[in-house]
Amino acid sequence: MIEIETSALGAMHAHAVEGFPEEVCGVLFASPNGQVVRRMTNVQNALHAADPTENPRDARTAYQFDGAELLEVTRQGDEAGWRIVLFYHSHPQHGAYFSDTDKSRALFGGEVDLGPAFPGVAYLVISVYDRVVRDRKTFAWNEAAQDFVETPFGSPAARHA
């Protein structure tokens, strides 16, 4: 089970609702003092504007982390002794599923044979319809299946109750 603190889940939901109708993205870290949500910049609109042939989708149906920002946030997390729990993004007006594009980006070099780009890190997809969170699902790499599969999540308090 992937542990997500209630306050962290609420922060990610709020980000998804505030960003609607565009996809949002971010990182959930585990720190010694609890989980930390870091909102990230979705650069998909800029990519689409710069080259609509190469990037036909805009931020309403796609997301892309700002690579420099992601590198800096993960560096800061490493320095603080934090661990990445998961990456999250939203699906405005769509269900909570892990798309082929999501899978490709989560794989090292986009190749199944190379495995996940971030071993041990899960992915949360938040479905938002008309500024209301309808569903959310987590996905993690399954070595036997050689694929990302839906994985249950819950709060740490619920697991210890």
Language-model segments: residues:
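Conserved beta-strand-loop surface patch within small alpha/beta domains used
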Residues: 1-84, 92-161
